[in-house]
Amino acid sequence: MLVEGPSELLLFERVLSTINPFYEVDGIYILSVEGVGFSQYCKILNALKIKWIVKTDNDLRRPRGKSDYVAYGFQRCNKIIGEETLPIQSYPDDSIANKRTLYAENKEALDDIRANCGIFLSVVDLENDLDEVLHDNLCEYLDTSDPVAYLQKAKHFHMADLVEAITDADCRTIFGHYNFACLEEITK
């Protein structure tokens, strides 16, 4: 599984080690691409005939010199697929509400991309999607009323703290949730 960065890597390793402590023996690996440059990794893995899955954020970004934000996460998915499957829309801001709306309006296509292309776009991003699954527990473990802001402030370090705090039951909850269906898919 290809992921954006160390936060995803830490969390997903913790979850998978609970579900299947020997997942690497079964040929399951998680690789951080340290950004969003998935396409080259996918090409190499395809050439080697290695199955891959991508987990990436539903980013809205403002192109240089423009006032509106575009669906950068959708562009990323289209690039990996090699065709324009998802619409590229403009938004006045990069709010979480806009990301959720964008996802909801295209959920059927995104589910098809999950099933047929192995690309799992977050509804929003790692931290918001995780908060949707475990909000109360995150508040308790991280001693904050805003776990998303806390996790995004110092991503790697704060995710390391969280990974130590979450329980096996939390891991099973994450594993079984739609937002993290990539984890179940990679274990098939």
Where are these regions (language model features)?
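Acidic, divalent-metal-binding catalytic cores of TOPRIM
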Residues: 1-188
